Amino acid sequence: TKTADVIRDVSTDKSQIGILYLNEFNEKVLTKLFRDAGLEFTELFSCGAYAYVWKNHPLANREEISIQDLQEYPCLAFEQGNSNSFYFAEEIFSTYDYKRVIKACDRATMLNLMVGLNGYTLCSGIICEELNGSDYRAIPLEQKERMHIGYVMRKNEIMSPICRKY
């Protein structure tokens, strides 16, 4: 889901919550957008960034990896539609000058490109094998930028029981 869509869906009551991340680069802009939309951000946890690769990627056996190590491989990023501001990018390091970037709209395409092209994406390191299978690895990045994972809700809204369970 596109970041701008998450903000719009929560602010218009289409969704009760939206899961997003803040980092040093996007925090001021997104916090202002949350405020303007009547939303508040609640941090769940913070974490470092990871490179997400196919298990047979040439770098898959590394214990840690740098952005420079990944230069020769295509970076896979989620398409952000008309809201293509760097601040809306779902991937951390959105301003880094990657040699090759391929944009996709869905997880299945992303996973296929990881296998077919030895591509990678950047993520929080939280991997759900039930969704993605066991053929992928998350490798910590040497860069120590923090991601603050959390949710946005409309201000003063009480979380529903189903939302709380989620």
Segments from the language model and where they lie:
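Short hydrophobic/charged patches on amphipathic alpha-helices used for structural packing
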Residues: 4-7, 11, 41, 67, ...
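Flexible hinge/capping segments at coil-to-helix
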Residues: 33-75
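Short beta-strand-to-loop elements that line the ligand-binding cleft
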Residues: 1-2, 77-78, 96-107
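Beta-alpha-beta core module
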Residues: 35-42, 46-48, 108-158
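Secondary-structure junction motif
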Residues: 27, 67, 71-96, 160-161
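Central regulatory/effector-binding core of bacterial HTH transcription factors
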Residues: 1-29
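Short beta-strand and adjacent tight-turn residues that come in two discontinuous sequence segments
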Residues: 18-22, 105, 122-124
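Short helix-loop capping/hinge motifs at secondary-structure junctions, enriched
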Residues: 56-65, 143-145, 156-163
